[in-house]
Amino acid sequence: MKIKSSEFIISAVKREQYPDDNLPEIAFVGRSNVGKSSIINSLTNRRGLAKVSQTPGKTRLINFFLLNKDFYLVDLPGYGYAKVSKKEKASWGATIERYLLNRGPLKKVVLLVDCRHKPTADDVQMYEWIKHYGYEVVVIATKSDKISNNQIGKSEKLIKETLGLPKDYKLKFFSSLNKKGKDELVDYLFDDLVEEI
């Protein structure tokens, strides 16, 4: 699939602010600083589409981007940043949960984890949440340029074991810097969304 057009539509907090045209949605979620904005910009070929923040925990809203005028890519707030109050953390959690609850157009959720580290308790909880709400989960290990090829196997084993993924699960590794395998990843993530239209 070619991403021919991508445009920012709205930043939302409340359900009534979400787009209501019933186009399919794919949501991206992950810890603060996992490289979410970078991967969105990389996959859509738009450098500044999602704002890359130098301050972790900056994305507090749900951002909707319309791709090819066919479907929405939804950027959910980053979670797990230590330097915010419990109240603020709870607020982000509520924002994400509100979106996941009975969101008809949502077809799949992409969970991003940093391939250099063991998934955190927050990552595990997010994975469980997504499954609990009945959505397809795609796990992508980001920042793969930061580890060597022989560390990939170890990283894959650790991520699968920690999240409880099946042994035959096809975990995807991606680097927004070298963009290796980008076209295949775009097809893997977005093709079936368009088939449904």
UniProtKB/Swiss-Prot annotation:
Keywords: Cell cycle, Cell division, GTP-binding, Magnesium, Metal-binding, Nucleotide-binding, Septation. Signal peptide: none annotated. It comes from the Bacteria. Gene3D superfamilies: P-loop containing nucleotide triphosphate hydrolases. PROSITE patterns: G_ENGB. Belongs to the TRAFAC class TrmE-Era-EngA-EngB-Septin-like GTPase superfamily. EngB GTPase family. Necessary for normal cell division and for the maintenance of normal septation. This is Probable GTP-binding protein EngB.
